[in-house]
Regions:
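ABC ATPase nucleotide-binding domains
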Residues: 184-206
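Conserved ABC ATPase signature
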Residues: 80-84, 88
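A short, proline-enriched helix->beta-strand linker immediately N-terminal to the Walker B motif
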Residues: 99-103
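Short, glycine/charged-rich "phosphate-handling" switch motifs in NTP-dependent
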Residues: 153, 165
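Helical segment within the ABC ATPase nucleotide-binding domain
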Residues: 120-134
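ABC-type ATPase nucleotide-binding domains, specifically the catalytic core motifs of the NBD
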Residues: 16-18, 39-41, 46-59, 69-71, ...
């Protein structure tokens, strides 16, 4: 029986406690944001640094950076996180994870439940963080269009299996990916997922 392992920075983290994984440099923003609703926005952000041991000066510097990346949170810093909008809560969750000073930030469905304009704003901020903080970012996302726009490399999964992978710009221009995952036909028009014949879908990944 095959037993999968998860390795990060050459260390097996399969059975490690979450706190130890964070100390190794991996942080995660779970699906649905999951902020501490009874804490203020600022308290939520600060709690992300609880595993750090690099000194208060460095932590204070990163704390200031979070408000530079997400200036809208400055205006609600003392508000209970539970009373914030979905977009604000997503920003809080990302800022909280970044306060752990991760080498890799993992985002699970960051667009879930957000309006299209907010989705684009969140992904633009994530892209900026990737460039400015030199942080590797791994995103699990069903919105293929925007995910392929901001990423450098992508994997397409179906039923838990990787069926296609490659550079994002190449996948973005792949006719099959455009038609099925982005609803764009070869003629440039948009196409509903319901209009894509299932036999074509099966044939592509065989």
């Amino acid at each position: 029986m095959w037993s999968p392992n998860i390795k990060f920075r050459n260390e097996d983290i399969t059975n490690l406690l979450g706190t130890k994984v964070v100390k190794l440099g991996a942080a995660m923003v779970p699906e649905g944001r999951r902020v501490f609703k009874h804490l203020s926005v600022d308290e939520n952000i600060r709690v992300g640094s609880i595993t750090r041991q690099d000194g208060s000066q460095s932590i204070r510097g990163d704390h200031r950076k979070m408000y530079d990346h997400f200036p809208i949170l400055k205006n609600v810093a003392h508000r209970l996180a539970g009373y914030c909008s979905g977009g604000e809560q997503q920003m809080i969750a990302i800022a909280r994870a970044l306060m752990a000073s991760p080498k890799m930030l993992m985002l699970d469905e960051p667009s879930l439940g957000l309006a299209p304009l907010l989705v684009r704003e969140i992904f633009e901020k994530v892209s900026n963080i990737n460039q400015e903080m030199d942080t590797t970012i791994l995103v699990v996302e069903q919105n293929a269009k925007i995910a392929l726009e901001v990423s450098s490399y992508a994997y397409i999964m179906e039923s838990g299996k990787i069926v296609l992978e490659g550079k994002s710009d190449e996948l973005r221009n792949n006719p099959d990916v455009k038609e099925f995952y982005m609803g764009i036909t070869q003629g440039g028009g948009r196409k509903s997922f319901k209009e894509v014949k299932s036999y074509k879908r099966r044939k592509r990944w065989m």
